[in-house]
């Protein structure tokens, strides 16, 4: 007979993911044991297995949820804008904002993805490619100088995502530059450079002091 779900199943499920994410990021996925997970979640091992059948399943759920949320945020940001530039800026804002709120998840996706099975890795990578494709398509539409061609498209895309994906290693969203201002800096620097002339910003979240 199938086991019945508790009334707070979804809340406990999410609590496990949140606690596991913190544990994996601080202690390391490979060093964290099921016993450590149970302690962090304040659950017995048996209760933990009621929600996930393995430590790997928990890691996959964390990464899958994070990347799907990023896709949803990027698509929502793009849908609210009409011009390509505003859509591009909104997409970068969405990525920066989520990464600023989820540095642990970003750290796990960069460092621990390879601990998943090949099939699960491909699932996550396929979702990541959707984000890259969304942003790269906008970037290509903004290129009025013909710099982005088949030979250079991936290089330009990875230059941009390199800045975004590894910002958790040095960027403090609680510091002097908030996520909205940082996102604008990324867009302006990537599209116009230090010496270039930046276009007016339709998407502005930062306030001047």
What are the language-model segments listed below?
Residues 61, 75-104, 156-160, 204-208:
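Hydrophobic alpha-helical connector segments
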Residues 90, 100-137, 144, 169-171:
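Short secondary-structure transition hinges
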Residues 106-110, 121, 143-189, 197-209:
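Hydrophobic/aromatic-rich alpha-helical bundle segments in the mid-to-C-terminal region
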Residues 1-27, 32-43, 57-60:
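Basic, helix-initiating cap at the start of DNA-binding domains
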Residues 24, 29, 33-34, 45, ...:
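Amphipathic alpha-helical segments enriched in hydrophobic/aromatic and basic residues
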Residues 41-52:
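Short hydrophobic/aromatic patch on the recognition helix
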Residues 12, 55, 66, 70, ...:
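Hydrophobic/aromatic residues within well-ordered alpha-helical segments
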Residues 68-71, 75, 119-144, 154-158, ...:
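Amphipathic alpha-helical packing segments from all-alpha helical-bundle domains
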């Amino acid at each position: 007979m199938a086991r019945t779900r508790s009334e707070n199943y979804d809340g406990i499920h999410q609590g496990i993911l949140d606690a596991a994410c913190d544990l994996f990021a601080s202690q390391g996925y490979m060093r964290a044991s099921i016993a450590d997970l149970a302690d962090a979640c304040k659950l017995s091992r048996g209760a933990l297995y009621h929600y996930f059948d393995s430590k790997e399943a928990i890691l996959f759920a964390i990464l899958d949820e994070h990347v799907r949320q990023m896709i949803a945020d990027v698509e929502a940001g793009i849908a609210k804008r009409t011009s390509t530039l505003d859509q591009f800026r909104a997409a970068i804002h969405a990525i920066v904002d989520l990464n600023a709120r989820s540095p642990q998840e970003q750290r796990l996706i960069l460092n621990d993805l390879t601990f998943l099975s090949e099939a699960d890795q491909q699932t996550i990578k396929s979702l990541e490619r959707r984000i890259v494709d969304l942003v790269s398509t906008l970037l290509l539409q903004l290129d009025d100088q013909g710099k982005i061609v088949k030979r250079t498209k991936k290089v330009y895309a990875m230059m941009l995502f390199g800045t975004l994906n590894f910002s958790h290693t040095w960027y403090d969203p609680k510091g002097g530059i908030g996520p909205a201002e940082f996102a604008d800096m990324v867009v302006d620097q990537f599209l116009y450079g230090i010496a270039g002339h930046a276009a007016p910003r339709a998407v502005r979240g930062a306030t001047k002091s």
